[in-house]
Amino acid sequence: RKELYRMMQIESITIKTKQMIDDLKAICANFGLGGSPGEYKIITQVFLYKYLSDKFGYEASKVEPSIAEAENVEAALTAMPDEDYEMMLMMLGGNVAKLKKNHYISYLFNHQNDDSMKKADGTPYPFHELFDDTLVDIANYNLDIFSVQTGSEEKIKLFEPISQYVIETAKKSAFCRAIINKLVEFSFAEVFEQKYDFFSQIFEYLIKDYNKDFGKYAEYYTPHTIADIIARIMVHGEVTNATVY
């Protein structure tokens, strides 16, 4: 009976995850990005942001008992005193991306219509800029752990701004709102408890439309940064004599 329940959990989260991917692709299509080179970069980066955010919450709840008992993990983390929060970050393992409180998906969701937000110079802070700045700041904050070095030892960051692919400035914030509203609908937390390799089939589903028809979407490949993260997720333990392309 326990095994049946576990499989039902996996089935449910698989359906939700594939629906999220389809919804993200639909959003791209609605904003004129369907089938464009930018669509693939948006989908993979947004999915990775979702994964790393949920993984962070899951790992934080393992090292901080009070968080594990909370109904809303991100809300409980946000309420933590800053000193306790910094201590918790130090206790997380090296394979977990570290997040600041304003990096959370819930933070972006709660501020998507906040007209009171201002930049340092006092000018309005459009939501698409907040979204982009959050992704870039996560990448910079985790540069030493989650980045890939080129042959010239230049570090390729985890994320880049995604609203740049929306041509019309007036539509950029609406695009980012549509994205963030899809990311709050469920959590991967249940999957992290399973030994089943859930994400292998999800990654196949994620890229299936970009790896067929020999050029229908121009020429696609998995960015080195994304491929490296995928490899770390799918392969556990030390690996030698292996190259990620």
What are these regions (language model features)?
Residues 1-239:
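Non-catalytic, mostly N-terminal accessory regions of nucleic-acid modification and defense proteins
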Residues 239-245:
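Conserved class I S-adenosyl-L-methionine
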